[in-house]
Amino acid sequence: MIGALARRLFGSPNDRRIKGYQPRVAAINALEPEVAALSDEALRARTVDFRAQIAAGATLDDILVPAFATVREAAKRTLGQRHFDVQLIGGMVLHEGDIAEMKTGEGKTLVATLAVYLNALAGKGVHVVTVNDYLAKRDSAWMGEIYTFLGMTTGVIVHGLSDAERKAAYGCDITYGTNNEYGFDYLRDNMKYTLEEMVQRGHAYAIVDEVDSILIDEARTPLIISGPLDDRSEFYNTIDTFLPKLDKATDFEVDEKQRTVTLTEVGMETIEVLLRDAGQLKGESLYDIENVSVVHHINQALRAHSLFQRDKDYIVRNDEVIIIDEFTGRMMPGRRYSEGLHQALEAKEHVTVQPENQTLASITFQNYFRMYDKLAGMTGTALTEADELFDIYKLEVVEIPTNVPIARLDEDDEVYRTQNEKYAAILAEVERANSRLQPVLVGTASIEKSEVLADYLKNNGYKQIDFADPKGMEKLYAAARAGKPAKLFAVLNARFHEQEAYIVAEAGVPGAITIATNMAGRGTDIKLGGSLEMRIEHETVDITDEAEKAAKIELIKADVERFRELVLRAEETIEIEPAKGAKPAKTLTRPGGLYIIGSERHESRRIDNQLRGRSGRQGDPGRSKFFLSLEDDLMRIFGSDRLDTMLTKLGLKEGEAIIHPWINKALEKAQQKVEARNFDIRKNLLKFDNVSNDQRKVIFDQRIDLMQDESVAETVSDMRHIFVEDLVAKHVPEHAYAEQWDVAGLKEELNRVLGLDLPVEEWAKEEGIAEEELLSRIENRADEHMAAKVAQWGPEMMRYAEKSILLQTLDHLWREHLVMLDHLRNVIGLRGYGQRDPLQEYKSEAFNLFEALIAHLREAVTAQLMRVEIVTQEPQPELPPMAAHKFDPQTGEDELAFASVALAPADDADKAARDPNRPETWGKVGRNEDCPCNSGKKYKHCHGRYA
């Protein structure tokens, strides 16, 4: 209450911040006549002048006012659009590294140009992040006109580009691309072996469009690059032949309850002998560093034979091992056990051993975007998540006033008892709206729910069409011109592509009915009457005669204007029956415009607000209403069964709805609870992610330092000395007598790792020799050995070998370390049962693993360099084959499973050789690529359906 009073007296913090921008807005407006009087050349020259000022010591804040005035004038001359005052404020918020919340249709894309231009003047590159390739290409071409006019370069990063094309795009002043592409390029860059191969040039400033979607909804979605391990089928089969030779009584112990198998001391000796005889043992001991993967696969083979039973845990069919679900008993084709277990089962059953994959690199969006020196974002709905955005990213959400007041009517929810009653009510509402040609967008929470609604419409005489199909749209246009409902509808789900943007843009045509899942077509405005630009682009593409084209454009313009008027007039007038003895009936008019119908509330208020926000752009009229049932997920979570009992007692009849503002408030409180819980989960998971992220940054930064150094001789020398120090300390304890030294063990290790046969026993027998003297002699011999190699092969060749071995070994051990961290993450929660904090335990264990990684790196690099034999024309180290993965947090589906997002994209020459009429010339086509037949459809929706 006191807070509300204070806000009335002094304004909210948001109001005060908006007010603080007004002096600079006034200054920009005052400059407008002066800038407008400049010639194109003089306006373009201001970019050079601004850069000179920055070079002389001026800050970006110092030149903000003239820079914004320059961009506004350039936009007027190139696009015919002028930034409103509220858009100038939005640009300032973005420049300050915060989030500008701007309602649908307020011109977020244009707003970004202000902050993008200003920050690009610094010369460090600006990244604009979009949610899909279509928007990246659209916005870079559209807004690129402004930047090009002002003498700046613009690049775009989309799927399928070569490394050279990517590097050129990142080298531009401004780069547009998707969050996926930026993240994968970062991961790939940190797997390259030279700086010249890297495509990104740093992370100075990024503006994230639809920031709530990327930084919250997809925050925990990891981007993963995996690669197949070498074909080791022979190795698995060899290991499998050892198992019958082991004695269960003496060689291993099985714990069926814990589902573990452990080798005994006797078993280890038996396995060592078998491995040595088969030529599979590296070094002397099974547990040497080189044999880590061998031990792992032996354990997996033991598990396959001892814990997994054929026809209970799996079946064998068509040369495949197929897992059986332990709960349902159903086969799960396509599912595979990880970490080599499935390969061990295949070897056990003597079927073809399929290759396994290994995670080569991964990062979450949370950790990727926090690398930027300055991060900003735009969205229509972020205020409800303001706490999380500030807590995790230190981004404040600033609500930007609309240029024109919102005229949308948001009605109270209608709550029904069952799903069937709810869908019947939605159908009736859609039919009423369609009868007056009011366009309707029905929002659903899932593809499954959208199909249910589609079936309801089909069963009631409606026909499903594709709004991207010109013939289907012409039926809709013809019906609208005749003033009759066409009874046509389209269904969209969240798979972004150009056709989808067109469908969404046409959802404002009179009589259009569109069923869409949450994110479908986000980033594309729904204009009343349809999109003039989209229609001109699609309907004139095949017209070559200029006069015919101009005539067609005029017809389209007349169509869109007439359609807009029809939609604006699609109001609903309702007569309210008077109470007994009252005055005659009153009428209630509900506005026309786009009618948003929500088929259920989502866990997040923000998603509901996004749906409502599709209507009422730039002061247009519109309506929104949610239809709910007590069987909806959110209602069930919060005790709809008790409410159902109460409504039954109150005599609520079938088909009747409850409508009351209290219901809305109760639902909002329920949503707030779910949001708070989800925030806590994300925050807790981030704490775990931070541990591996800190280690990733150390490794990646170290890699770049190594690549920057002309020579890593000093680094490998230090590693060799530290390794020898640790080795001597292990066998020659400090302050111990010479008789207590493990001289034989030290000699053996020096021979095994360094390949040096040193007279350690003789040195140890010398009178008065101390451990320091022993250490010094060993280091000197090791240094002499390396100096001899340098003399033999030459400094240049040796420097190359040192860097190659160091980088390749680091990469190999880092990948193994990632696997270990994954294993640790999966089991660390069990420590909670022992009254230990899993997070602290994870930090401690992960640190120990990281220390072990560094120690293994020293040993492995030292061992390889001491034994290295260089051949002439040493080949450049090659990166392993890679595949990119991004798992949908809702479905668990790999969104990139069928996309060709490998390190080396498809060769442009191969694509150029494709004949649209001859599928045999197409080669391998990614399922999400455009179909080579030039239909405009994705391959998976065209010829790929039959592949």
From Swiss-Prot:
GO annotation, cellular component aspect: cell envelope Sec protein transport complex; cytosol; plasma membrane
Cofactor binding: number and manner: May bind 1 zinc ion per subunit.
Keywords: ATP-binding, Cell inner membrane, Cell membrane, Cytoplasm, Membrane, Metal-binding, Nucleotide-binding, Protein transport, Translocase, Translocation, Transport, Zinc
Bias (Basic and acidic residues): 908-918
SMART domains registered for this protein in UniProt: SecA_DEAD, SecA_PP_bind
CDD domains according to UniProt: DEXDc_SecA, SF2_C_secA
Ligand binding (Zn(2+)): 931, 933, 942-943
Keyword field contains Nucleotide-binding: yes
Compartmental location: Cell inner membrane; Cytoplasm
Main location: membrane
BP terms from Gene Ontology: intracellular protein transmembrane transport; protein import; protein targeting; protein transport by the Sec complex
GO MF entries: ATP binding; metal ion binding; protein-exporting ATPase activity
Obligatory cofactor(s): Zn(2+)
One Pfam family linked to the record: SecA_PP_bind
Protein's UniProt keywords contain ATP-binding: yes
EC number: 7.4.2.8
Membrane topology summary: Peripheral membrane protein
Catalytic reaction equation(s): ATP + H2O + cellular proteinSide 1 = ADP + phosphate + cellular proteinSide 2
Stretches the record annotates as Disordered: 907-937
Function comment: Part of the Sec protein translocase complex. Interacts with the SecYEG preprotein conducting channel. Has a central role in coupling the hydrolysis of ATP to the transfer of proteins into and across the cell membrane, serving both as a receptor for the preprotein-SecB complex and as an ATP-driven molecular motor driving the stepwise translocation of polypeptide chains across the membrane.
Family membership noted in the UniProt record: Belongs to the SecA family.
NCBIfam families: PRK12904.1 (NF009538), secA (TIGR00963)
Record text on subunit structure and interactions: Monomer and homodimer. Part of the essential Sec protein translocation apparatus which comprises SecA, SecYEG and auxiliary proteins SecDF-YajC and YidC.
Protein name (Swiss-Prot/TrEMBL): Protein translocase subunit SecA 1
